Amino acid sequence: MPNNQYPEFVPVEPNWNQNTVAVQAGRPARFAGAPMNTPVTLSSTYVHTTDLGYGRDGNQSWGALEEVLGQLEGGIATTFSSGLAAATAIADLIVSGGTLLVPTDAYYGVKNIFARLEMHKRLNVRLIDLENTDSTIAALKGADAIWMESIANPTLVVADIPAIVNEAKKLNILTIVDSTFATPLRQRPLDFGADIVLQSVTKFLGGHSDILLGAVICKSNAHAEFMLKHRHDFGAIPGGLDAFLALRGLRTLAVRLDRSETNALEL
């Protein structure tokens, strides 16, 4: 969502569908001579008149991308240098020594992160069969957070997110959904009550195999502020050109998804 680090954007109308939001959100406010696209910002430092003073604090290109992702997911987006950098930021949110439930078929890079954190006694990791909703719900007791990946990469397992989130909330468990394969045009986990969504922008959102980017979309302001602080402190920032290219990819996301689904059904 917009903040005082970035210029104003074209307002998103309540009656726009998701396809229109993907095309129109994040464009600069319109005035005579204004560009239709947010220009690429390549700068390490800024004039100290706002919170945007140094390159780790923000970038106008990120801001436009975060505006689109936040609008599409229904939350507050923070972008990172890769999907795994975004996953690491989420892991940092979990209390030290806390128990994290992770699907057995989660993306290998994510499992590597959690294995390393467990090795250093930062987290306790318990593996779950996310496809089995009953056993997943039974495993919630004693956990601090649950990581769901739906649709899973590459097994294509689909989780019953609403049912699992509903039970997790009763136990005050942090709920995280990697929704990369679904994209926000096919699934919005925050609408199901999840706390946090991960998107590897590298994949469908970027769509052209020419960038590495990740994003964390949070429902609460507190979690969003934590992500901003983590990015500033750890420095896993996206490049301005990468953000620009991701925006370009988002503009065609709807038609690319439609064609992919048509081709899959034909096959």
Predicted feature descriptions by range:
Residues 2-14, 24, 28-31, 77-267:
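Conserved PLP-enzyme active-site core in the AAT-like
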Residues 2-61, 65-68:
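N-terminal "arm"/small-domain region of PLP-dependent enzymes with the aminotransferase-like
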Residues 64, 68-72, 78, 85-86:
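Glycine-rich loop-to-alpha-helix module at the N-terminal edge of alpha/beta enzyme cores
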